[in-house]
Amino acid sequence: MKFRSLVKATSQALTNLGYTPLFPNLDYSGENKDVALTIKEKNKLAWDHYKAVEEADAVYFILPQGYMGTSCKIELGYALALKKPIYYSEPTKDIGLDGYPKKFISLDNLIEFNDEFSRK
């Protein structure tokens, strides 16, 4: 997974705000890169992410410098098919992708999720 350390930090920040982030396989490797060595392994990791999309109330895409890789694009399509609310950390600068999020919520301003979801 690219940007693993950033995803871990974001997961912790969301937890601190009272959310339950579903970021599968964060501890699969300490490396910030794709570490699957076989197609079978890659498929297993991908399906773990699709299951998290199914279970999520909303899907937040962490997009450093607007980068969205192939796996994220597939997850985006799946989330859209499931009619999940979509959020991006920043625009991708691709109008084909930037029309989908309900809102852009920067990594520095995750508290904005409290405005999106009623906190009782």
Region roles according to the model:
Residues M1-K120:
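Conserved catalytic or regulatory cores that recognize and/or transform ribose-phosphate-containing ligands
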